[in-house]
């Protein structure tokens, strides 16, 4: 192995020969990153991306000033989806080293499963990967049940079964229980529900190539809530939390669902399918019904649900929706504490009524007269949350994945949101 390139931190500007406002410069000993005191974490992340772009695959964080946040910022920019990189980390105290190690374990897991090709990450694969991670961090405190294929139909998980039946790979529901006390009667503090569409062709409302080429990442919500629970456990979570992953491929076949089909859910709601590419809300509905039945204090669902959220926020923020102002504010406080970006978008009672159908109680997509697609999608989901006005958060995961590299990020998954949700779970 070649000798590691040393990366140091400097609070002095770079020599003029490196250019005005240079992020970094080469020194006799390696590379110096020039901090300005303004968004130093962002600067370090951008420098990490540039250093990786120069083909330097073995580096050492050296000298003074490195703490867990600066080390992590460097890694977020330096890490890419292909090729191996090694970092010799600067010395940290025991608490910071533990935090860094857990971020590397869990958030890298999230990025890896989202980046994996759909051929390798089908519904069953995703569910099993989630089980493996949580069993690793939670040990005997974790139990789970997997329901798949026709068993879903027999148990009336009609949204998940309907969406997934068109694929040769059967749909899967993972119900996982983290119960630190071991008491079967212990109250459930929170339920986390994740959309796990492992490939989304759009179904018969088929996507164009430009919108389909990143759809291996349509299980980003499932990865996010799985990682959030795992990371919360590493931070000492001592409350009972249930994880529900709704995993399926959305494919075209002779057995795939069609426009005009009507889905009858266990809570009595009927939904007319008028767009098979609005499938995420159909599978999440089953998970939210199960979550509501647990009577938890907190329900969080996460999904790469709408293009409308990306149009509003780009890939820089996750979109947050809630009727519970106090809870939404606590989530935003957790995001600020963890240096992650969330932005609240509107969700009002009238959004719940913008899904008209001539043949069912709800349409799975709003009509042309109601263009607020991210808000109406959240409104749809609210019909499957028993007490939707309190204790429910919906995350539209617009920051989960980037199709192209930018100055701070390589192409692919980001891992944004894991720390925020873990913070909320452990702080509540």
Curated annotation (Swiss-Prot):
Cross-referenced Gene3D superfamilies: Zn peptidases (3.40.630.10)
Catalysis performed (reactions): Release of an N-terminal amino acid, Xaa, from a peptide or arylamide. Xaa is preferably Glu or Asp but may be other amino acids, including Leu, Met, His, Cys and Gln
Top EC category: hydrolase
InterPro entries noted in UniProt: Leucine_aapep/pepB (IPR011356), M17_PepB-like_N (IPR047620), Pept_M17_PepB (IPR008330), Peptidase_M17_C (IPR000819)
Keyword Ribonucleoprotein among UniProt keywords: no
Entry keyword annotation includes Manganese: yes
A Gene Ontology BP annotation from the UniProt entry: proteolysis
Cofactor: Mn(2+)
GO molecular function terms listed in the Swiss-Prot or TrEMBL record: manganese ion binding; metalloaminopeptidase activity
Enzyme Commission number(s) of this protein: 3.4.11.23
Keyword tags: Aminopeptidase, Cytoplasm, Hydrolase, Manganese, Metal-binding, Protease
Residues engaged in binding Mn(2+) 2: 195, 200, 218, 279
Catalytic residues identified in the record: 207, 281
Main location: cytoplasm
Free-text cofactor note: Binds 2 manganese ions per subunit.
Entries under Pfam families matching the protein: DUF3663, Peptidase_M17
Origin: domain of life: Bacteria
UniProt-annotated location(s): Cytoplasm
Sites where the protein binds Mn(2+) 1: 200, 277, 279
Cellular component terms per the entry's GO annotation: cytoplasm
Known role: Probably plays an important role in intracellular peptide degradation.
Subunit description: Homohexamer.
Family the entry assigns: Belongs to the peptidase M17 family.
Protein name, entry field: Peptidase B
Organism per entry: Cronobacter sakazakii (strain ATCC BAA-894)
